[in-house]
Structure formats: structure tokens, C-alpha cells
From Swiss-Prot:
Keywords: Coiled coil, Cytoplasm. The lineage of its organism: Eukaryota, Metazoa, Chordata, Craniata, Vertebrata. Residues 126-169 are annotated as: Disordered. Residues 126-135 have a biased composition (Low complexity). This is Vimentin-type intermediate filament-associated coiled-coil protein. It comes from the Eukaryota. The keyword Nucleotide-binding does not apply. The keyword DNA-binding does not apply. Residues 7-89 form a coiled coil.
Length: 169
């Protein structure tokens, strides 16, 4: 076998050198990629740890908030029960006072005529008694002689009470 020509040897050497350079370059890139992956893995692990801590804190905060809300709910329910009892008591009081309110409304409806009657009685008191006169001659506009079917008691009462109205207002 004959020796390969020098050109082939140089080409083969150049090719081997290029392969070695390429291998070294790839190894350098692989090392860089491994460092990058390792750094990313560390960052991800740290980030995962931070997220787990935040998630744990959120869980504790949620539990605290649930406890607070349960306490508020119990307080609100107690308040509702208290208010319902108060409403029931007031409803009972209203039921008891309703007849009295109706009576007062009836009194208020009757007040104006009663006030008119009291004014008329006061006017009668102001006028005073009739002057004494002869029973045979009644004053004009006054009561007339006793009727035929009268018992005469009315005349006796008029004789005993000379005032028109014997009341004071």
C-alpha cells in the first residue's frame, strides 16, 4: 500500500482539527448549557420554595379569615335572635295596646262635638239663672204652663232649681 498523498493527509489533518475544534466548542456550549440549566434549576427550586411558603401563608390567612368570619356569623346570629325576641315583645305590646289606641281614636273623633257641648254649657253658666218671676206669667221664650198630661213634678223641680243649668264647667 502506498502512502496517502500529502494533500489528503493535510486535508485529513485539517478535518480532524476542525472536528476537534467543533468538539471543544460543543463541549464549551454543553458546559455553558449545563451551568445555565443548573442555575435555572436552583432558581426554580428557590422560586418553588417561595411559592410553597406563600401558599402556606395563604392557607394560614384563609384559616384565620374563616375563623374570624365564623365568629362574626355567630355574633350576627346572636344579634338576629335578640332582635327577633325584641320584635316579638314589641308585637305583643302592640297587640295589647291596640284596643287602647282604638279607644283613644274614638275619643279623638268625639272630641269636637264634646268641645262644642262644653262651650254651650259654659255659655249657659255665664248667662246665669233666670230672674225670679211669677209662676203664672212665665218669661217670654221660657217654658209654658204645664201640659195637661204633666204630673207636675217638672214644675216642682224647676221651682227647686232656679238656675237653667246647675252645673259648673
Amino acid at each position: 500500500m502506498s502512502a496517502p498523498p500529502a494533500l489528503q493527509i493535510r486535508e485529513a489533518n485539517a478535518h480532524l482539527a476542525a472536528v476537534h475544534r467543533r468538539a471543544a466548542e460543543l463541549e464549551a456550549r454543553l458546559d455553558a448549557a449545563e451551568r445555565t440549566v443548573h442555575a435555572q434549576a436552583e432558581r426554580l427550586a428557590l422560586h418553588d420554595q417561595q411559592l410553597r411558603a406563600a401558599l402556606d401563608e395563604l392557607g394560614r390567612a384563609k384559616d384565620r379569615e374563616i375563623a374570624t368570619l365564623q365568629e362574626q356569623l355567630m355574633t350576627s346570629e346572636a344579634t338576629v335572635h335578640s332582635l327577633q325576641a325584641t320584635v316579638h315583645q314589641r308585637d305583643e305590646l302592640i297587640r295589647q295596646l291596640q284596643p287602647r289606641a282604638e279607644l283613644l281614636q274614638d275619643i279623638c273623633r268625639r272630641r269636637p262635638p264634646l268641645a262644642g257641648l262644653l262651650d254651650a254649657l259654659a255659655e249657659a253658666e255665664r248667662l246665669g239663672p233666670l230672674p225670679a218671676s211669677d209662676p203664672g206669667h212665665p218669661p217670654p221664650g221660657g217654658p209654658g204652663p204645664p201640659l195637661d198630661n204633666s204630673t207636675g213634678e217638672e214644675a216642682d223641680r224647676d221651682h227647686l232649681q232656679p238656675a237653667v243649668f246647675g252645673t259648673t264647667v
